[in-house]
A protein has these predicted regions:
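Polar/charged low-complexity regulatory segments
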Residues: 147-297, 301-388
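Primary recognition of N-terminal secretory signal peptides and signal-anchoring hydrophobic helices
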Residues: 2-150
Length: 388
């Protein structure tokens, strides 16, 4: 957050100069806000210019960024929280409090036609976004400030790792975060991206907040289902065919043992087990967590680094890694595909579709280059933010 505040003054000064010739809302044409290159729709109130600042409905921008929004009617205080950071603003007060520290703004939040309007540039910058103004088109462009990852290739690792579930869950395999943050709705649920990601994390993973997410990601990276597989594979080696048949005959869940397939996968991959089944889903958790507003972009990449390193150390191409993933998925799902072409299974075909449509994200050269970490944040730094 200190880095964000240090950049804020210069950024907002440049925007002030750019907007200085723009009239106020009552006398000016409409203003459009774009997030990650896509129009940010407004349903209840349109953006306008106030004191050379673009004012937007609070929910329009805050929810797109994955913020939780709180309102204290008694004090007229708006509270925005995202990824461990908190911003408080009071209606008609030009001082914001960012993690408790006062920051002077040259325009205050206001209420217009029963809608709380906030200064887009300040709020976006408080949460690590880059803001640009195009005076000719009267557009505000907000994007993730990815300069924090300058020189790192962790996003290039993350995209192919998370591409399978991005494809299956109506997302975008070539978009970090799996969904475009500005889209109106996702799939059949028609939920906003941040809400859809929170739903997935909660219903499928029992992850309801930042701490849950970070803890689960760390656990999955270094243990996960691969530990279960390797334990079962070791057990298979100790049992004779007669013992296997006796156990199966006495059990009502005999298909779950999958003796032959477990043995086959173990012999095929050795100590690697079903490593990619865990690592690839971990990338999904991290990207969902980013879009949900639980972690920042920089934190998401830091959390991916250990998984990307394990992947790079154990595999030499994306096709090899995805073959391991497919074996892991079918073992976990108890799909006995022994003797079948793994690439003709449902997810095998999905992988081929992804490669056909998003082939540029599958760069085998990464396995030669290796993992290039972030310049200013490590996974240990992220873990240190958890309660002791």
């Amino acid at each position: 957050m200190k880095k964000k505040l240090s950049k804020l003054t210069a950024l907002l000064l440049s925007l002030t100069l750019a907007l200085s010739i723009v009239p106020v809302w009552a006398d000016s044409p409409s203003v459009s806000v774009y997030l990650d290159g896509h129009f940010l729709s407004h349903t209840d109130a349109r953006p306008y210019i106030l004191n050379d600042r673009t004012m937007v409905p609070i929910y329009q921008l805050a929810q797109a960024l994955g913020c939780d929004v709180g309102w204290d009617g008694a004090t007229k205080t708006v509270t925005l929280t995202r990824a461990g950071d908190t911003v408080k603003m009071v209606i008609d007060d030009p001082t914001a409090y960012v993690n408790g520290k006062p920051v002077a703004m040259d325009v205050a939040p206001t209420i217009m036609e029963d809608r709380t309007m906030i200064p887009a540039a300040y709020v976006a910058a408080f949460f690590g976004q880059k803001v640009e103004w195009d005076g000719e088109t009267r557009r505000v462009y907000i994007t993730e400030d990815k300069s924090v990852a300058e020189g790192s290739n962790l996003e290039a690792w993350a995209l192919p790792m998370g591409s399978m579930l991005a494809q299956l869950d109506h997302g975008k395999p070539d978009c970090f975060g799996l969904y475009a943050r500005s889209v109106a709705g996702i799939g059949l649920s028609n939920k906003l991206p941040y809400a859809e990601c929170r739903k997935i994390l909660s219903s499928s993973w029992s992850i309801k907040n930042r701490d849950d997410l970070i803890g689960t990601v760390i656990s999955m990276t270094f243990s996960g289902h691969n530990d279960n597989f390797r334990g079962m594979a070791a057990d298979v080696k100790l049992r004779s065919q007669a013992e296997r048949e006796a156990i199966s005959a006495a059990s009502s869940v005999w298909p779950l043992y999958m003796w032959e397939y477990t043995e086959y996968v173990d012999e095929k991959w050795g100590d690697r087990g079903i490593l990619c089944w865990d690592l690839f889903r971990m990338s999904n958790l991290v990207q969902w967590g980013y879009t949900a507003g639980y972690i920042t972009y920089e934190e998401a990449l830091a959390l991916i680094e250990p998984a990307a390193t394990l992947l790079c150390e154990n595999f030499s191409s994306w096709e090899e890694a995805y073959e391991n993933y497919l074996d892991g998925y079918n073992w976990w799902a108890r799909n006995d595909v022994l003797g079948k072409d793994i690439w003709q299974t449902s997810r095998g075909k999905t992988y081929q579709t992804i490669k056909q449509n998003y082939g540029s994200i599958f760069q085998d050269s990464l396995f030669e280059t290796g993992v290039i970490p972030l310049p200013g944040l490590s996974v240990e730094d992220v873990i240190a933010t958890l309660p002791s």
